[in-house]
Regions:
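Canonical Rossmann dinucleotide-binding motif of NAD(H)/NADP(H)-dependent dehydrogenases/reductases
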Residues: 1-30
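Conserved glycine-rich Rossmann-like NAD(P)H-binding loop of the short-chain dehydrogenase/reductase
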Residues: 26-41
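Rossmann-like short-chain dehydrogenase/reductase
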Residues: 38, 63, 69, 73, ...
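Rossmann-fold cofactor-recognition segment
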Residues: 46-64, 84-87
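C-terminal helical subdomain
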Residues: 143-184
């Protein structure tokens, strides 16, 4: 029987508490990150370092990402859950991850938690996914306080993503997106 595991893209920064939480839920967590020292620090900070595995690769480099994912999937099968915060500078990274998972196994369901910035909410893009992918979208909004607004903190983002995972809603908004003209600049 394979271990439950999660693949987290963007886990060394604002999603690090999501990584810690997944470990507390008995997942083996594989974190894709460009910076080996940040991956090492994340591992040192977790309560079960043996369950956190850094994958040092720049997801903007499709060839390197593909090689690392091939090794990971060959060893572990497909992940139970993918948590993805990918910058717009790498538009090919998420489609590559989805395609590689679907080539491995179309019979096992997996969840994709796709985290996007507030501006994506207006676009309502269609994100194609394989038939065995349970797609969930999380929009990161902002906080209104004292007639002003601010962006979400890393803790607020992580809490919102964890809420999205536990409730399994198709769409989650962390913070608020309205009124739109109150977004921080």
């Amino acid at each position: 029987m394979k271990n439950h595991y999660a693949l987290v893209v963007g886990g060394t920064g604002m999603l690090k508490n999501v990584c810690h939480w997944l470990i507390e839920q008995d997942y083996h967590v594989y974190v894709i990150g460009r910076n080996q020292s940040k991956l090492n620090k994340l591992k040192q900070e977790t309560i079960q370092p043996e369950n956190l595995h850094g994958v040092a690769v720049d997801y903007q480099n499709s060839t390197c990402l593909s090689n690392e994912l091939s090794n990971l999937f060959e060893t572990n099968g497909i992940p139970d859950i993918v948590v993805s915060w990918i910058h717009s500078s790498a538009p090919q990274a998420l489609p590559l991850i989805k395609d590689m998972i679907s080539k491995q196994d179309l019979s096992t369901d997996w969840r994709l938690i796709h985290i996007q910035g507030s501006a994506r909410f207006l676009e309502k893009e269609n994100t194609p996914v394989p038939k065995n992918c349970l797609y969930r979208r999380v929009y990161l909004g902002f906080i209104l306080e004292n007639n002003d607004s601010r962006w979400l903190t890393h803790n607020e983002i992580s809490s919102g993503v964890i809420h999205a995972i536990t409730t399994d809603s198709n769409e989650t908004i962390v913070g608020t997106l309205e009124p739109w003209d109150m977004r921080p600049q």
